[in-house]
Amino acid sequence: MNNNKTPDLLKVIVAGALVLLVVHTLGRFIYTPLLPLLIQDGVLTVKQGADVASWNYLGYLTGAVLAMRWHRIEQIRSVLPWALGINVLCTLLQTQTENFELLSFLRLANGISNGIVFVQAPALILEWLARHGRASASGLVYLGVGGGLIVSSGLVSLPADFLSGAQRWWPAFLLSVP
């Protein structure tokens, strides 16, 4: 292996893993450990919590389908930063509301942006890896999701005693900002 390519490979994999950590773990999966606390805080009922999750799932499906529409590399390079920005903005706005309808809308938008990023970021990275003869490293980008699951659990449980309601989204937002 050419040592000159190692730093580039590491940068590409780490960047991709961090993007997936932000959108998929902090944007999507953190809702699972947050939900019982949001119910306990009176922000959501059990039914509302399920409805909010369903809006996010619908958004994710919609985003994944939209991502297939924007499949050329130049389209991905254009759409990906916007989708990532929207995802982080949704997480920020979730820190400001306990309104069920607004939270449902934000989770829908979060899901759409997540679906786009989750399809497009690995595609862009795979294209780069293939061009540099390193396609076998493509699975490493998903370490962001796995590692992020562990991180998100801590982001919910560690501040659980001193955050409440919409404040519980703050740790996810703060970690999402570059």
Language-model regions, residue ranges each:
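Pair of pore-lining "gating" transmembrane helices in MFS-fold secondary transporters
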Residues: L9-I30
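Small-residue-rich segments within alpha-helical transmembrane domains of MFS-like 12-TM solute carriers
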Residues: T25, F29, G111-V119, I150
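Helix-loop-helix hairpin linking two adjacent transmembrane segments in secondary transporters
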Residues: G133, L140-P178
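Conserved MFS/SLC helix-loop-helix module at the cytosolic interface between two early adjacent transmembrane helices
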Residues: T62-E98
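Cytoplasmic helix-loop-helix junction between adjacent transmembrane helices
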Residues: L106-L143
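Paired small-residue
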Residues: C90, E101-A109
